[in-house]
Amino acid sequence: ACCSTSFCGFPICSSVGTCGSSCGQPTCSQTSCCQPTSIQTSCCQPISIQTSCCQPTCLQTSGCETGCGIGGSIGYDQVGSSGAVSSRTRWCRPDCRVEGTSLPPCCVVSCTSPSCCQLYYAQASCCRPSYCGQSCCRPACCCQPTCIEPVCEPTC
């Protein structure tokens, strides 16, 4: 199955996972989100009480137009080789305690372990916040491999 949506302002179509009604909810940009495969359990992350939205590691995300987010506009002269301009005014952040951050889109892909931390479990001092509630560990931190209750540690 192929899910069409956009991330960082660019349309993408990914065949990762499967499309189904089990991921539909108002905070998603589409009613059916990409679901993780058996080896990609960290691709989707719970939002609010139920269901989930897809993470950048799935090459599929949700718009997260509503819910907890940060306002503002971030522009980039060039993204990759396309030279396109990306402007995002709202993104998903389940933990409202981490506010006022401004990071480049898609920063998750540059992390050693993109699914190491999630903001509502991990310590803010240990994790670098990113889009859609997922965060990357800072160089001096290491988190549990699972996303159930990741905890930052001083060393790996």
From Swiss-Prot:
Pfam families named in the record: Keratin_B2
Family annotation (InterPro entries): KAP
Repeat positions for Sequence: 26-35, 36-45, 46-55, 56-65
Residues found modified as N-acetylalanine: A1
The keyword NADP is assigned to this record: no
Function: The keratin products of mammalian epidermal derivatives such as wool and hair consist of microfibrils embedded in a rigid matrix of other proteins. The matrix proteins include the high-sulfur and high-tyrosine keratins, having molecular weights of 6-20 kDa, whereas the microfibrils contain the larger, low-sulfur keratins (40-56 kDa).
Leftover remarks: The source of this keratin is lincoln wool.
The protein, known as: Keratin, high-sulfur matrix protein, B2B
